[in-house]
Amino acid sequence: MIATGGVITGLAALKRQDSTRSQYHLSAQSPGPAPEKKTTKRKPRADVVVVRGKIRLYSASGFFLVLGVLILMAGIAMAVLGYWPHKDQPKAPETKMSANNTQSFGREQAGSIAQFLEQHMHSEKMKMLGPFTMGIGIFIFICANAILHENRDRETKVIHMRDMYSTVIDIHSLRIKEQKCTNGACMGPYGGDTEIRTFGLDSQFASRLAANTLMSFSGLDGDVRFSHRTSSADDDDGLMSEARGGFCLLSPTYKDRSECIFGFQDDGRWEDRRGALKKCQTRSIVSSSISAFTLPVIKLNNCVIDEPDIDSITEDLEQSRVHSRPPSMESLTVPVPDIAKAFKPPGVQLLRSNSATESASSTSSRSSLSPGSTSGRFLSPGAARKDFGSNNSIHMLSAHSKSLDLERGPTKLTVQPEQRKHPSWPRLDRSNSKGYTRLENKEDPMDRLIVPPVDVKKDYTKKEKLLMISRSHNNLSFEHDEFMSSGLKRGTSETRF
């Protein structure tokens, strides 16, 4: 079958050659621009190059091919001797005797070959063995021919595979070079987009929200505030602008992540490296606030912070905004804790809006600088790690995140006594969080620590408000130092789920 297939392919090739020759003769006979037609017809044949292996006759299959041909020739000769036609029959006996004498004389002269031919001429053995020998020769010839063509096809396959491998390797090397060139040209020194793939959508939104929170607490850009946005496009633009404003506050590792997520780089990157001292002062606050931002609602060390009434704060909101100035990182001071004035029966209040947070931060900064307030000291890196640790930043971020989740404007808010007792209810009720259970009638360990609230006067002067805010910060720092001295771990917190 393989031999017949090879013969059929050869016949098809001959037919193609005949068709091309006939077309060539017709084009030569037809008048017109003959050379142009010749060139146009020869070009596609020159482009198509059929690569095939060689038929190697100097091999075992070639030897058997020759052997089969020889056996076939011997069988043909034997069949010819057996089926050689007979002569005319003798006419008379006299002539027959004379003919026998002449034949005997010719036999002596002819020799052994003539004797062999005369003996096996018209013999039954030759008639039988001749075709049989021919069949054996033909069988050996066909098998050897098939083996020769199989070897040639194997060589052609090897050649094609080598060509394919070489082309694939060349294409792969060219692609690698192109990718290197494109990565070096487009990505530049920050090469690659692997960090973008590693961070998902949740980490992107969390980092954006963390950048916005840092902007609100840093005060470097006083005009940046959280506002209610209706469209998603305006929300993305606002987040990008706020992240660019607070980009200088991030530590180096988070700055690289924010570069990958937001898609921009800091313009004054090299200038910020020169001011490493200022970064050293703010790095502890930023790192602790970012690490604590992804935590749920947190209650700090089982203590309640004493804060003024939210109704009295919201009444003087516009006046505090007029007189407040954006605080800088150099003006941040840590009040020295006063043990005599530290403890006060706490009245639990919640900051419900970003405006209340801004007014509280501005009044606290002014109280630290005013002569009537408690004595303070400038912020150093060690003090930042100690006083502005994870506890304070977590409290600030939790209060601020509540204002973000509630999405309330700078309006007057009232706090129910049940909500004062359980500060995590509004966030868990209004957010789409799953897995949280409300502790309604169960015994709360905070109830044991909370002293019955004292009636607070509604009419406070500005000095009294400032004193109350400063006492709340003194209360927090005093309890923090007390826990540190007792051997507890830093940043211990109780998470309510």
Swiss-Prot record:
Disulfide linkage: none
Ranges per topology, Extracellular: 83-127
Keyword Glycoprotein among record annotations: yes
Keywords assigned by UniProt, alphabetized: Glycoprotein, Membrane, Transmembrane, Transmembrane helix
Biased composition (Basic and acidic residues): 427-438
Source domain of life: Eukaryota
Subcellular location(s) per record: Membrane
Region (Disordered): 20-44, 353-385, 400-438
PANTHER family assigned: AGAP005329-PA, TRANSMEMBRANE PROTEIN 200A
Protein name (record): Transmembrane protein 200A
